[in-house]
Amino acid sequence: GVLHPITQGEWEVTDFVGLRGDKVYYISTESSPLKRDLYRVGLDGKHKERLTPGDGYYSIYPSADLSYYICEGGDSSAPGRTDVFNAAGKRVRTLYDNAPLKEALAEAGLPVREFFTFTTERGDELNGYMLKPLDFDPAKRYPVLLTQYSGPGSQQVAEGWGPDWEDALVTHGYIVVCVDPRGTGYRGEEFKKLTYGNLGRLEVEDQISTARYMA
């Protein structure tokens, strides 16, 4: 027989969660390369549904028969939550909603990642995020620190929540910017393999383009 894809589109399936009856459960970047959502679709490719509760970055831990699964995650604006869902995507129990931590962070104040996309002088679209001081004044100029990793297939610009040293630096009056250059992951095979056999050149070019964009 001839094999046919169940799904298709300009996005990646990042994980196969399981098969229950005639439904396939999988995680993909369909809404954005920055996000991970759980989807369910028939083996015939029809009746596709997104099951995760909202746009964000989620991890899924299914039971053996996929009658239930644990959904953990959220977006970059606040700590995520952990819930149990049934196979139909209905929340049946909240294990942890991080409410105490959310209240404490609301009082303390933390910068929120601002995501952006820009086009380099070579015509490549790159995704990035920016952290600004809480008292940011658009009329002022600030020192900018570019942070990056850029390893093949990696990703630093994503919707998941998780404060790091960058948040501390922002409190001292810096803007922190991170951009995933050519060769990083979750934007398709062609984009990821642009640096194959040529590590170090394109990544540096894209960081220079980022600095020019921020100037």
Walk through the language-model features, giving the residues of each:
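Multi-bladed beta-propeller domains
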Residues: 1-15, 20, 31, 41-58, ...
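Residue-level detector of Asp-centered blade-edge/turn motifs that repeat once per structural unit
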Residues: 19-21, 64-65
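Hydrophobic beta-strand positions that form the internal "hydrophobic ladder"
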Residues: 24-25, 69
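Short, conserved, GDST-rich strand-edge loop motifs in beta-rich repeat architectures
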Residues: 28-30, 154
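Short, solvent-exposed loop/turn segments at conserved positions within beta-propeller repeat blades
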Residues: 30-35, 75-78
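C-terminal structured "cap/appendage" subdomains that terminate the fold
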Residues: 34-36, 42, 66-68
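Repetitive beta-architecture junctions, highlighting loop-to-beta-strand starts
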Residues: 36-38, 46, 80-82
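Serine-hydrolase catalytic core recognition
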Residues: 59-215
